Amino acid sequence: MTLRDLKVGQSARIKAVGGEGELRQHFLDMGVIPGAELTLVKLAPMGDPMEFQIHGYELTLRLADAEQIDAEQIETRSRAHTRVEIIEEKEHPGLGEEGKYHVKGDGDPLPEGTRLTFALVGNQNCGKTTLFNQLTGSNQHIGNFPGVTVDRKDAPIRGRENTSVTDLPGIYSMSPYSSEEIVSRNFVIDDHPKAIINIVDATNIERNMYLTMQLLEMEIPVVVALNMMDEVTGNSGSIDVNGMEAMLGTPVVPISAAKNEGVDELVRHAIHIAKYQEKPGRQDFCDENEFGGAVHRCIHAVAHLIEDHVKAADLPLRFAATKIIEGDHLILDRLGLDENEKETIEHLIIQMEKERGLDRSAAIADMRFNFIEKVCENCVVKPKESKERIRSEKIDRILTGKYTAIPCFIGIMLAVFYLTFNVIGAGLQKLLEMGIDALTVQVGKLLTAANVNVVVKSLVMDGIFAGVGSVLSFLPIIVTLFFFLSLMEDSGYIARVAFVMDKLLRKIGLSGKSIVPMLIGFGCTVPAVMATRTLPSERDRKMTILLTPYMSCSAKLPIYAFFVSAFFPGKGGLIMAGLYFLGIAIGIIVAMVYRSTLFKGNAVPFVMELPNYRLPGAKNVGQLLWEKAKDFLQKAFTVIFLATICIWFLQSFDMHLNMVKDSQDSILAAIAGLLVPIFKPLGLGDWRICTSLISGIMAKESVVSTLEILFNGSVTAAITTRAAASLLVFSLLYSPCIAAIASIKREMGHRWAVMVVIWQCVVAWLAAFVVHMIGGIL
């Protein structure tokens, strides 16, 4: 039988893992190895993918991938907590604290003044960025779904001069499966940090320590930070930290990054091992007496053969040996072995496979997990099923239930739109508008009383206040939307959306993981494009990048709110939701076109860990809202401010720089008039509208400020409701802003960026034309 044949609630023992290449290696690295036991927790609402519990965590696999894994059914495993004798508490010796305790006595101290660089490495969603913020005093965003960090971030350790810690994207192993894993691996191998801070989720030692074992092979000082220890002890678990240090041969520090507990001790350990270059005391995890010693002999023989090549390539010996046995072509290419050496190594590996009864990759993974099992048996009392896990299961019965998941998702999104555009956001917007209007009146009176020059007064009132002021009034709506998105992200719900939507997205050629960048795209396209780095397939990554701009970003909200309140009063929530779902629908159609033309083939398999639901932290949510509000205000007083001044100047003066009484005679009218024939079939044949749409390429918010300046607040009298609907659809779909274009260029190159601009303008024109025609019929 295969894993696909399991029924919900049944358990099985893996016999063989099929497939090949990077995906199979990823399965092995995640603990899907021969001999591992797992239980089918549930199926997604559409029947695919499947959710398994293995090594104490939840892993999702598609039916097609589960079919490649042979298994035998076993008695259903109990998920209840089995109580064993609790480990005797011992005082942690404080290894290396204050740099006074020198454990090995043979350290190689760095010269005084050497900059101490640290790599912060760990699995996805293990609290790495939380620890980075505690170490450095930074305010990097934290989320409760795998893959929040997609690029390295550097900052000095707070209170420690001449130090730098780098927050790397989360990885499950040192195998290059996705682009962000390559970033992390290359940094550790090529940038040679002075020490590694390996953060481990203490509630799931089995999965996390697989990466730890690979890091110990890197010949770089390592300190292991056992994070979330408060959850372990709070659920009747315990860890013998001293015993774990002895077995791993490197310092182990219990911490709670979220509560800032143990972080100071961790810093002292890290500084000490970096300063004295105290490398791990153990790198050999293969037992010569285990399974006849086949794996042990193979690793040591390969290490001996490649020793000279490893030194020349500046790679760690033990790491290179195990990666060559696994078949890591990137490491093999760097060593430059000749054919005789390759043949000898291949012969050694084949002999090992025969003796061990497992293929090369599975044998290495099995060796590591066997050692991890010994560590857990000797040092870890697993916590009972946590209240977070129990709570997550109860919530998932509804939010990922067969008949309730999709209605819940639609209902949640509609509630977000209604509360944002009709209740909370709209109410706060009215209050801010009243304040801005009052300030505008007072400033106008002051300028009149001071007898200020008419040109300057026009600039201030018709330019700055009309433009920037109109955009600022939409700040409450944007902050409210980000508030709800933050709640969805921090709670862990977005990861569930990926699980629920995988089968649906596969029909258009994408993976369920693509939903995460797309949902981020509702906030801003720039981080959404960067978030695609978590996707393992280049095809999926490019396709998702090209579809992300169809998810309406928050910068377009001022446009929608402006026209909806003016032309569709009382229908704000309905129109807004319609626009968002229209963007998604157009994106689906475009994806189907891409799938049959530019990106033929199927999406990569869906392998994802589902985190427990957690209550969103007030500090994290508040921090995110502040960052988004600050970004909006900075844009309002920089890009939009300059754009409004430029628009004011161009619409106030003619070609001879004489101030005009009628903007029809202005420089702007002459330039924008060239585009009028293009927009006329859409019912947008007014040069002022053409101008506002062009300014929107700089920043979407400037569309509203430009309209306010050019129409002097009388836009409702200048265009019809039919034209307003056409304009809304065009604004929804046309070219993303310059910042988003730049991020697409950075990820895909300038040709793709240019193509996105042209293609989206064409799609927007066609969609707006259809809406305009339908409006004419109705």
Question: Language-model features: where?
Answer:
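Conserved G1/Walker A P-loop phosphate-binding module
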Residues: H92-S173
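Conserved C-terminal guanine-recognition region of P-loop GTPase G domains, centered on the G4
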Residues: R185-P251, I559
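Canonical P-loop GTPase G-domain recognition
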Residues: V232-F285
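Extended helical scaffolds that flank P-loop GTPase cores
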Residues: G249, Y276, Q283-V452, H656-L668
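Extended, low-charge hydrophobic alpha-helical regions
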Residues: A362-D366, K382, V423-I464, I508, ...
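Juxtamembrane inter-helical linkers in multi-pass membrane proteins
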Residues: M434, A438-Q442, A495-T525, K600-L624, ...
